[in-house]
Structures are given as structure tokens and as C-alpha cells.
């Protein structure tokens, strides 16, 4: 845990002094890549199971999916790596983690000038550890970031719209089906190129999803009580199963509430014309609130959309505002990210603590 805290404090102090310094940015990108590259198999949820599956995979399709079901592209990648580069699964997972980090950095450079603020949030909000815990999904998302960085999704042309759709579908088919959720990105980007989505509408979506979340929580407790009285039935059992808080996702009732309140604050901070990245982030929070307690994959979808929120939060770090309002926002960002970071370490979501080197 100490290494995570030391890096977080060090990055926080430097970032507040130099939010746009490229030397600092490249240094931490390389550091993060090295940490991901040289971690042991005990760091991250997927590593042990994925490594067992990797050892079975060859270029013969009959050896695929014997332990875990992988998409065909991921099976081929593992087989080719094992055949021609190395039989070490941790080397492949480490390279994927570094690939994820570098493409995230490229994405930040494309869409915000406050690159170190984005990198700080990337680390403190746990998005960096995403590549430790959800290997296929983070790699698929990194491939999409290559496309998002190559084009300007804020000024999406019709031709780029179809390219973006194609890349998302291909990544979803070959590497991880959760990427289908990102099909909303080109549609929202194309819509917002001509029309604005009002802050009031974003508030409405957020509020409705928040109410839906607490309705599910209430159903969970009520049905649990009814179940204890012996009044069981198919409908009751169905309601209980579908109202559980997704413990695997690491999102408790308090944490979802915290995220939702922060999302409302970000909408309030937005100028008259809403930002594409804010809109995408709010969509992610709505997905978390509405469906994250039903299926853990929806909580993972939120983690992807959280990257768009990082861009927005980094952008308004230096927005021209009345002095006090801007400083309150900066303090709020630091408190929000530090609270989630501490929660991440204490609860050890994804088995990232303690950090161990592979050698």
C-alpha cells in the first residue's frame, strides 16, 4: 500500500504546482507503465486465472476457452505472443498494461491542456488500476483510445462517425463485448456537434437514475424482510436477486451516492453550453445508478465512461471563473479523488494491495 500512497502524494504535490508540465507528464506515464509491466501475478483480480488460461492456449482453436471464455481476438493474440515472443503470461499482461497507460496519456494530451491534472485523476480515481484487474476490457478500451485520439470526436465528421462505429464493433467482437456500450459515443458526439444538450436535461437524467437506484435498494430491504417471514415465491426471489448491490464492482450505497452528488456538482460547474465529455460522463453515472446493482458489467461500463469525466474535470481546473468558485472547485476535486483513492486501497478492490514486483 505504501508505494501507492507515496506515488499519489508525490503526484498530487507536483501536479498542483505544474498542471501542464510535459516533463512531469511523461515521467509519470513511464512510471505507471513500468509499475504495470513489472507487477507480480498476485497484483490484480484477473492475473492468476488469465495466466492459467494462457498456458493452455495455442494456435489450435481447440485449446481456446478451456478455462475461461475469451473473445477470438484475445485468444489469437495470446497464442501468437506465446508462439513467437514469450511463454510468460505476466509479460503479456504487463505489456497490455503499459499499452493502456500510454494510450490513455495520448488521449489526455489530445483533449485537455491540463495533462497532469488528468493524469492525477487517472491515478487517484483508480482508472489506472483498471488494467491490473480487468485485462481484456482495458486492452480493448486502449485500442479504442487509439481511434479516439486519431480523430477529433468533438468535431466528428460523418466519415469519422462510421469509422468510429466500425472500430468499436470490431473491438467488441474481438476483445470484449462491453465495448458495445461505447457505441453511444459517436451518436452523442454527432448530435452535440449541431445541438446542445441542456444542463437541465443532464440533471433530470441523473436525478431519475439516482431515484431508480434507491428504489432498487428499498426493494432489496423490503423483499429481504418479506423473505425472512417465509413469504417466498418466484416474484419475490426475482426481486431479491435483481436488487442486490454489486459487491464485485466495489460500489456501495454510500459510494454511489457520493459519485452521484459529485456528478451533479460538475453539471452545476458547466457553462451555458454543455461539454461532450461531461455529457458522456453523466451517461456513465446514469448507467451505474440504473443498472450497476443488477449486473457487475454495468459498473465496469461506468469505469470506462469515467475517463470522459476525467477529461472534463481537468479542463475546468483552469476555467475562467470567479476566484473563490474556482478554488472551491479545485479543493473539491482533490477531496473527491482522495476519498475514492483511500477507499480503493482500504477495501483493496481488485486485489491490488500489497504491490509486489515480478522479479
Task: Describe each model-derived feature in a short phrase.
Residues 95-111:
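Transmembrane-helix motifs of polytopic, lipid-linked glycan transferases
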Residues 163-176, 182-188, 285-289:
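Membrane-interface alpha helices of multi-pass inner-membrane proteins
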Residues 23-26, 108-125:
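Transmembrane-helix signature of polytopic, membrane-embedded enzymes
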Residues 130-144, 148, 175, 266-318:
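Membrane-water interface signatures at transmembrane helix termini and the short loops
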Amino acid at each position: 500500500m505504501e508505494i501507492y500512497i507515496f506515488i499519489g502524494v508525490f503526484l498530487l504535490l507536483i501536479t498542483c504546482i505544474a498542471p501542464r508540465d510535459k516533463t512531469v507528464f511523461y515521467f509519470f506515464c513511464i512510471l505507471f507503465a513500468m509499475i504495470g509491466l513489472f507487477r507480480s501475478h498476485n497484483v490484480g483480480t484477473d492475473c492468476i486465472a488469465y495466466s492459467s488460461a494462457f498456458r493452455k492456449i495455442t494456435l489450435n482453436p481447440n485449446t481456446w476457452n478451456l478455462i475461461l471464455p475469451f473473445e477470438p481476438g484475445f485468444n489469437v493474440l495470446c497464442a501468437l505472443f506465446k508462439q513467437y515472443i514469450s511463454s510468460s503470461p505476466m509479460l503479456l499482461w504487463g505489456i497490455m498494461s503499459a499499452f493502456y497507460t500510454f494510450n490513455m496519456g495520448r488521449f489526455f494530451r489530445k483533449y485537455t491542456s491540463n495533462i497532469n491534472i488528468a493524469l492525477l485523476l487517472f491515478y487517484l480515481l483508480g482508472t489506472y488500476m483498471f488494467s491490473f484487474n480487468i485485462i481484456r476490457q482495458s486492452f480493448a478500451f486502449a485500442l479504442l483510445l487509439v481511434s479516439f485520439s486519431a480523430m477529433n470526436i468533438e468535431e466528428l465528421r460523418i466519415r469519422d462517425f462510421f469509422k468510429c462505429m466500425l472500430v468499436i464493433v470490431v473491438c467488441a467482437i474481438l476483445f470484449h463485448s462491453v465495448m458495445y456500450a461505447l457505441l453511444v459515443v459517436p451518436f452523442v458526439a454527432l448530435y452535440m456537434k449541431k445541438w446542445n444538450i441542456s444542463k437541465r436535461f443532464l440533471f433530470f437524467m441523473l436525478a431519475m437514475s439516482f431515484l431508480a437506484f434507491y428504489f432498487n435498494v428499498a426493494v432489496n430491504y423490503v423483499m429481504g424482510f418479506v423473505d425472512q417471514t417465509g413469504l417466498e415465491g418466484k416474484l419475490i426471489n426475482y426481486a431479491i436477486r435483481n436488487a442486490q448491490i454489486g459487491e464485485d464492482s466495489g460500489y456501495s450505497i454510500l459510494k454511489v451516492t457520493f459519485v452521484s452528488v459529485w456528478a451533479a456538482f460538475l453539471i452545476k460547474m458547466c457553462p451555458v453550453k454543455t461539454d461532450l465529455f461531461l455529457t458522456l460522463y453523466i451517461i456513465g453515472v446514469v448507467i451505474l445508478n440504473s443498472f450497476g446493482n443488477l449486473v457487475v458489467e454495468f459498473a465496469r461500463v461506468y469505469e470506462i465512461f469515467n475517463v470522459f469525466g476525467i477529461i472534463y474535470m481537468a479542463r475546468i481546473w483552469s476555467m475562467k471563473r470567479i476566484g473563490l468558485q474556482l478554488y472551491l472547485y479545485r479543493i473539491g476535486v482533490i477531496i473527491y479523488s482522495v476519498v475514492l483513492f483511500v477507499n480503493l486501497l482500504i477495501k483493496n478492490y481488485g486485489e491490488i494491495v500489497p504491490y509486489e514486483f515480478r522479479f
